[in-house]
């Protein structure tokens, strides 16, 4: 058992929380075994969890490509990341834009944020909660769920990712 208030402790706590929220299982040895990768496995998703005590996480294209590749090898699961900032104070879901649309998530909520991506001409992007803290000014349509959104697209690679608060991701996932 990891000592309380260590990164390992926070990571274990995050993995258990993510697994529970997805009705999934925590991967043995946190994905270190050759036959089971990533941190959490559900029927639909292969999830890589990252936690930091900072108010940002630097997501590299290499990290994303690794979970994406593992998800395909693992039985055609969708790659998903859960980034915990400030020791879990804020959690952000990151997924491919094509999966986001394929699951109709783009239709199940009203989003604050521009679905036109920020173009990232680098091999990393800083993930922060800044996009979440803006007031939600739009009038909601009946039955729509309000959700903050940030899209990024790595150039010249074309990888388009969508970031939304983890709690919103779970709520939208559970919508009919």
Which residues make up each language-model segment?
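Catalytic phosphate/metal-binding cores of nucleic-acid and nucleotide-processing enzymes, i.e., regions
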Residues: 1-176
